Amino acid sequence: MTHQETLQETLQLAAQKLKAGAPEEALAILEPQRDLCAHAADFWQLLALAHKGMGDSAAAEAAFTSSIAIDPQPHVLTNLANLHRSLRQAETALAYYDQALALASDHLPAQINRARALLDLNRYSDARLAFQTILQANPDHRNATLGLAQASQQLGEQEQALGLFQSVLDGDPTNTVALNGMGISLKTLGYIDDAVNYLQAGAQQAPESPELYTNLASALAQADREDEAVAAYSRALGLSPYDVDLHDWFNGYLGVIAHPQYLDSYRGALEQQPNNVGLATALARKLLLSGRGPEAQSVLEAARSAGGDRPSLETDLSYVYREQGFFNEALVSARSAARLAPQHPDVQRELATALMASGEGYGEALEILDTLLRSYPVDQGLWALCATALRYTDNTERYKRLIDYDRLVQVRTVNAPDEFESLKAFIVYLQDSLNLLHTTQRHPVEQSAVNGTQTLDDLFSRRHHSIDVLKQALEAQLYSVLENLPADDAHPLMSRSTGGLRFSDSWSIKLRDQGFHKNHFHSQGWLSSAFYLRVPDSINYSAAEGWIKFGEPGFRTREPLSAEYWILPREGALVVFPSYLWHGTEPLSQTRERMSVGYDILPT
């Protein structure tokens, strides 16, 4: 047998094994021929696929690179890009897809997967354009249609997404991606029963999909079907037991329905993976927020003893220590984390916070925060901490420019739509509608409200008359606020103003029984606002009871700073303020409820 015949036979046999799903057998065929076939690009391509099938990503990357060095073929570059995408290295993958398309602009696998990499990177507008371009040349391409639907979904275009998903289901009624997509969009729009039906159909078709069961659980929770929601979440965790986000969603739901198994899933998973930092830090934070600081500390110390990532654990230990008032211990942990990972932004953020909490280095904290803000200029949390550092260092002029309450905090009153005889009638209509959405029993521990309830999912994405008229009434006032913002290219708020806006998140809160909001900022906003729908009479004559307050930091400190500015809530009024402002409320003394709608705004 000639050398060429041996090469061809080796490649054919290996390709057959790979096609049959037997990468180990393909590897056994290829490895003995490495020296003989080392000059052949296709040999390295198949070897790479065999290594990838065996889960050896490093060996697969090396073999793909060897193939490309001999002959840079578009399909090999695409396969290398796919490898990086599977490793969640979307930026690197994108570069290789671009190289493949530079060699063959019509290479469809590279086009499709490049668009999916854009989805991975949250570049939804770019992904939408990429999928639209593919569909112009390939109008019946199912994968591209699904990709366009998913991009539209992420851009808030739920109706368009529904039409695209339905077009796939028309030709393939059991397509699980489309069934899942229909369920997500319908849930987002508030059509909960229909969402449950689609997601149940999807779960029947893909009983091993944790994503489908997670989305089904969320829809069942919205439908107030508690037992079924818990069962669906449990099923999802059984399929993906170490998914940190899934544990978070599940326990977030268990917490607000006062379920006795709250936090149990974390402990079960940590018994199997005691060094899992993501699970340990998430559990510790929930324990701390539930008033169980010593347990939180023990969880983190156990993960550290098990060999978990030291910088992350020391960072969270600092947080747990300082919120219990152990300021010196917090600073020791924060500095330890900074020595281990000096360039990590979360580590530096915690060090700055620990320095201020301990009272040991206000100037150093400000230097750290100023450095971070040069890299992350729209981070609302950094601006909140920076404001605190400016106040501690008596940097009055700069603080006044950043925190000018009289200029930056606005109060407006909505106008009732024409269909309502009065503002009071409008308010009562909204109260009645939103009451139906408050289906839980307790406040989420991760959020600011204490003693109350919060609606599930994004409120303003729902398609309901009450939500539509509320948004329109609020937008009329919010655009007026934007029109009156002064121009200032150097200010973190004014410099981003475009005159346009979109809601990035929204919810309704009901406080009761001495309820209040802890001091906090809004990390996902640019402007934030509270709209008041029900206000107890007591706030009019008690000492700031129920009032919204500004300026008091939301972390425990050795030398506390007090609030600086208060506003009296009024039914029908909205308070608008920069998202980076620390704000909370004074506790209520009466059992009567206070109802509000909160929302974050981003410039468009």
PLM regions and their residue ranges:
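Short coil turns that delineate tetratricopeptide repeat
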Residues: 38, 71-72, 105, 139, ...
